[in-house]
């Protein structure tokens, strides 16, 4: 998993404050905007936070990408397994961590699998992934279209997403997906997004008590 910044609105916090003062044009160029942004967050005037945007590159797996793509307030561009050879991203499929299913909460897992069992099962997974990747490559060599060959690949296959959204969307996504109830691997992505967000939007992050 890796998350990196691609682009962000120039002077984003200043720009949002400028737009927030649309009804007070004589004060729009006021450089003191921290208090205004804090006020807007405190009183949930969220529309102003739709005026600035950020795009991140997220390198993850197909399984996690399916969860991320459900956040429809964002716009996405994803690596196409139909157009491109998946080996362009990585020739190996990463072995996932293994956790026990929580029988009381089906959306939760518990990290208490014995090490010996974990190693045994991860080796089985490694063999399975290698066989799947070998078959995928064989299909390509035989002239089978990528759009057909991709169906033998597991959900752990690497993918790349460009995720673009407003500050408001990022606040909602990070708040939701960095909290309990989110799959650990997705939580790690959300926290990586949060780290970049706090660097790019320090005033907003402080008002949200993220720093």
For each feature predicted by the language model, list its residue ranges.
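Family-specific signature for flavin-dependent thymidylate synthase
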Residues: 1-211
């Amino acid at each position: 998993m890796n998350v990196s910044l691609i682009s962000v609105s120039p002077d984003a916090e200043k720009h949002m404050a400028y737009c927030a003062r649309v009804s007070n044009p004589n004060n729009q160029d006021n450089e003191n905007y921290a208090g205004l942004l804090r006020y807007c967050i405190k009183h949930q005037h969220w529309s102003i936070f739709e005026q600035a945007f950020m795009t991140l590159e997220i390198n993850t797996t197909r399984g996690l990408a399916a969860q991320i793509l459900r956040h429809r307030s964002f716009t996405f561009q994803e690596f196409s397994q139909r157009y491109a050879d998946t080996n362009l991203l990585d020739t190996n499929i990463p072995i996932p961590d293994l956790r026990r299913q929580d029988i009381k909460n089906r959306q939760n897992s518990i990290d208490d699998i014995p090490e010996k069992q974990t190693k045994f099962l991860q080796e089985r997974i490694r063999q399975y992934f290698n066989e799947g990747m070998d078959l995928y490559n064989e299909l390509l060599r035989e002239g089978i279209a990528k759009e057909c060959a991709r169906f033998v690949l597991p959900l752990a296959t690497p993918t790349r997403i460009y995720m673009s959204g407003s500050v408001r969307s990022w606040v909602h996504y990070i708040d939701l997906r960095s909290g309990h109830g989110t799959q650990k691997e997705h939580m790690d992505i959300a926290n990586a997004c949060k780290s970049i967000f706090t660097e790019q939007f320090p005033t907003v992050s402080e008002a949200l008590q993220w720093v």
